[in-house]
Amino acid sequence: MSSEKLRLKVLEVVQETGDAHSIVFEKPSGVSYKPGQFLTLRLPHVDGPVARCYSLSSSPYTDDHLKVTVKRVKDGRGSNWVCDEVLQGHELDVLAPSGTFTPKSLDTDLLLLAGGSGITPVMSIVKSSLAKGTGRMLLVYANRDEQSVIFHQELREMVAEHPYRLVVLHWLETVQGLPSRKPLQEIVRPWAHAEAFICGPAPFMDCAADALKELGVSRDRIHVERFTSLEGDPWTEVEAVAPEPGGKTVDLVVELDGETHELDWPADQKLLDFLLDKGLDAPYSCRQGDCSACACKLLEGEVTMLNNNVLEKEDLAEGWILACQSLPVSDVVKVSYDA
């Protein structure tokens, strides 16, 4: 996990489907990531640079380079530029990998539900589990038609190589109609014990999550990744609000990258700003509450968030908070980026 700003060279551009491209970046030494995480790219635009988060479809266990896969969005300011303009040899500004849409263990059974470009982080998880894990996987992959299926051949080859560990079921709108709750339930019922990961268009994710909840799958085993467009520019220095001299502080314990830090946290300074001021390499991207790059888990105490456009009520119930928007409420707070 890192907020490090990188300048990455494009090694290859692969056209996956008529409206989806993969961008393969050179991977600098020292950069690591987990399956299911994303990169934040800085892209030019007539109205000024825009930042977009694109999931990694590469695996840290099987791929030497970083690869993101981008599908065109109608009138999308970022996706269309990537698909039309990025060429081999270009260099782009990128924030180091981050995100929490990643399995705690690759040895557990996984239920993967993807729609359209939602296959991107799921592909990273599939490849990683097959390479380093022992768990079995069911992937339900929904698309408009067969021509829209990203990674069609690669998925077919992985199933052929690992028939007892990976099952892939395609749901095509032109054949079966839009995914609906009851048919999905019947498909995934035998996998209700597994850790579930859902990514795709909002209606698909809501349908899939509702189907799992009605089957009795506990919320802590349902992981959802929502694609959002960022409004700010993470490369622009944000003027953090300095704490009032002599103001109230609270006892803060932070678990980050395997280390524990005990600090006096000013009550009027946001958690992320404070950690960065202290020289800690806490992850972040938008700094506006619009993405989950800075998410950490509240283990003890209470905070208030000034803005939250990404965490759902179930996430909040589990203790997830956005460090970029959190102020302390209780006198003692403990958070973990490693949970």
Q: Where are the model-predicted features located?
A:
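FNR/FR-type flavoprotein reductase catalytic core
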Residues: 80-244, 248-253, 260
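Short, surface-exposed secondary-structure boundary micro-motifs
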Residues: 44, 97-98, 338
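Ferredoxin-reductase
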Residues: 2-91, 108-109, 143-145, 156-159, ...
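C-terminal accessory/binding modules appended to enzymatic or scaffolding proteins
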Residues: 247-287
